[in-house]
Each structure stands twice: as C-alpha cells, then as structure tokens.
C-alpha cells in the first residue's frame, strides 16, 4: 500500500482529507507496535496525532500508510536469510489494530500460497541485493506492509508454533553469502 514519509503534519493532513479512508501512522524506526495509530479524516484526534508524530513540524519524520482492510484476517511474518524465505507464521490482531505479538496478537503456523511464495522469491532477491542478510517481512498478499531489518524477530515464535528451530539454517545461509 502507499507509504508516505513526511516531517510536515500539514502535508499528511491534506492527504488524509483529500483521499479519505483509514491510514496507519507510525514512526520510521520502532518496534513492538509502539506509536502505531489508525487515523481517519473525521476523527477528532487525527490532526493532534499528526502533529505529535511529526513533533509539530520540528524535523521528525512520520510514516503514513494506507490501511489494508484485509489485515483484519491477519498478516504473515516471513523470515528471510541469505535472500530466501526460511519460515513464516500468521499474526492476527485481537485487542486492537496492531498485529504485534507483544500487543496481544494471536499467532498460528501457516503456509505460503503459490502467489505468496513467488512474491517472497522476489522479496528475497531484493533483500539480498540491498545487503540485508537476515530480515522479517510483514505481508498481506499482495501487499508488503513492512520490512524489519534491524530486529526481525520471529525465531522463537516459529519454534513454539512448529517445533522447528531455524537458527542454524539462518546462520548457514547468512554466512554462505
């Protein structure tokens, strides 16, 4: 979905007003679902959240992404190592809109569809080309929601859901390149 970085809350506000619909606000760096909000033009706190997330125009970036309705059915966290997908699981929001495990999301083992597998092949090539040897990608096919290259997470969750320990495989793939 469209992802718009900006330091100006006014620019983001105009986009929300003109395009309508739901949008996700989040910081460019962060984890665990902290400071991730859904905003809509008619909500009374949308402008205040935009102002806060951009530090009132004082040079702090905010990311705004079109909300993907299908995420209500869950998103898949896919782990990549050495340019290939190595494991995945599904996360579904339970308490609020955030699919982060620490925020109460429910997890389950899952497979990738043929179309998701093809998309992951292309994502793996992209990640390898960018030098990202280990990453987690959140996706709701056909959308890539987020790339997680600093702290991909998910190894423990996959082990708990499937009994498969991917650590050695990931190390081998990362070191092979």
What do these predicted ranges mean?
Residues 4, 79-80, 138:
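Well-ordered beta-strand positions
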Residues 1, 21-22, 60-62, 132, ...:
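A structural micro-motif
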Residues 10-13, 51, 168, 172:
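Amphipathic, non-transmembrane alpha-helical secondary structure
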Residues 9-10, 19-24, 28-119, 123, ...:
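Phosphate-binding site of ATP-dependent enzymes
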Residues 94-98, 111-177:
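ATP-dependent carboxylate activation and anion-phosphoryl transfer catalytic cores
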Residues 1-5, 10-13:
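Conserved N-proximal alpha/beta basic substrate-recognition cap immediately N-terminal to
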């Amino acid at each position: 979905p469209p992802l718009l970085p900006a330091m100006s809350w006014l620019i983001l506000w105009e986009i929300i007003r003109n395009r309508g619909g739901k949008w996700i606000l989040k910081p460019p760096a962060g984890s665990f679902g902290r400071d991730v909000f859904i905003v809509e033009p008619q909500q009374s706190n949308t402008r205040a959240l935009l102002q806060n997330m951009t530090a009132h125009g004082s040079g702090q970036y905010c990311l705004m992404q079109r909300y993907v309705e299908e995420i209500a059915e869950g998103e898949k966290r896919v782990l990549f190592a050495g340019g290939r997908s190595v494991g995945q699981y599904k996360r579904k929001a339970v308490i609020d809109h955030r699919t982060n495990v620490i925020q109460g999301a429910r997890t389950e083992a899952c497979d990738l569809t043929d179309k998701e597998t093809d998309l992951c092949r292309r994502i793996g090539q992209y990640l390898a080309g960018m030098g990202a040897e280990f990453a987690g990608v959140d996706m709701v096919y056909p959308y890539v929601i987020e790339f997680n290259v600093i702290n991909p997470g998910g190894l423990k969750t996959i082990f708990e859901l499937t009994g498969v320990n991917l650590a050695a495989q990931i190390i081998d793939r990362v070191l092979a390149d």
